[in-house]
Swiss-Prot record:
One of its GO terms (biological process) is translation. Keywords: Ribonucleoprotein, Ribosomal protein, RNA-binding, rRNA-binding. Pfam families: KH_2, Ribosomal_S3_C. Part of the 30S ribosomal subunit. Forms a tight complex with proteins S10 and S14. Binds the lower part of the 30S subunit head. Binds mRNA in the 70S ribosome, positioning it for translation. GO terms for cellular component: cytosolic small ribosomal subunit. This is Small ribosomal subunit protein uS3. It comes from the Bacteria. One of its GO terms (molecular function) is structural constituent of ribosome. Belongs to the universal ribosomal protein uS3 family. InterPro entries: KH_dom (IPR004087), KH_dom-like_a/b (IPR015946), KH_dom_type_2 (IPR004044), KH_sf_prok-type (IPR009019), Ribosomal_S3_C_sf (IPR036419), Ribosomal_uS3_bac-typ (IPR005704), Ribosomal_uS3_C (IPR001351), Ribosomal_uS3_CS (IPR018280). Gene3D superfamilies: 3.30.300.20, Ribosomal protein S3, C-terminal domain. Residues 39-108 form the KH type-2 domain.
Length: 238
């Protein structure tokens, strides 16, 4: 029986880039990996209502951590006068015990971001919206926003049924086997009175040619960054 692998992991190094960029020796590797996981969980929990799609972490040799937060609502993350992102930077510094710089990157079209779409469906299911209605709505929005194809699958006790099952819908073309195809994948869970429901989303945005380095996305825009300089003063750019 064939199994589906994560489309992002299959394309890393070809048309996708790593979400974590750093090198470490065997002694420190495990600690840094756990630290990255804690940072991601904290940021995701703190910015739950801000529509965080992806969190990239980079580490430099000078003991500095750079966190790139991809969000659909950058204004909520930055806050009034940049206070929100400054508080976030300080909280991350407490976790990592290192100098931290935070970049806020806007996701221009959240309707075509698979992770945000999956979380949107989960949000609706937790509020007792019909799973079929929720899936079809996000599919229509994605296709109208320029996606070439989308597939959504929901698993669990759908509608409170006794036996769990998987039900999905697709529209357009989603070529999972083509490595040059830009497939955006997202997963989210919905906590309902009948148990957990899992939502998977695949969005096809077109073909891209493999290039060295990160593939530039027309769906993102850097809107601000905050870091701490060597003199301890806050430096902010928008």
């Amino acid at each position: 029986m064939g199994q589906k692998v994560n489309p992002h992991g299959l394309r890393v190094g070809i048309i996708k880039d790593w979400d974590t960029k750093w090198y470490a020796n065997k002694r420190d590797f495990g600690d840094l990996l756990v630290e990255d996981n804690e940072i991601r969980k904290f940021v995701k929990k703190k910015l739950f209502l801000s529509g965080v799609s992806r969190i990239e972490i980079e580490r430099a040799a000078n003991n500095k951590v750079k966190v790139n937060v991809h969000t659909a609502k950058p204004g909520m993350v930055i806050g009034k006068g940049g206070q929100g992102v400054e508080d976030l930077r300080k909280d991350i510094e407490k976790i990592s015990k290192k100098n931290v710089a935070v970049n806020v990157i806007e996701v221009k079209r959240p309707e075509t971001d698979a992770q945000l779409v999956a979380e949107n469906v989960a949000f609706q299911l937790e509020r007792r919206v019909s799973f079929r209605r929720a899936m079809k709505q996000v599919m229509q929005r994605a296709m109208k926003s320029g996606a070439k194809g989308i597939k959504v699958a929901t698993s669990g006790r759908l509608g409170g049924a006794e036996m769990a099952r998987t039900e999905g819908y697709s529209q357009g073309n989603v070529p999972l086997q083509t490595l040059r195809a830009d497939i955006n994948y997202g997963f989210a869970e919905a906590d309902t009175t009948y148990g957990k429901l899992g939502i998977k989303v695949w969005i096809y945005k077109g073909e891209v040619l493999p290039t060295k380095g990160r593939v530039a996305s027309n769906n993102e825009e850097v809107v601000g960054n905050v870091e701490k300089n060597t003199r301890g003063k806050k430096r902010e750019a928008k």
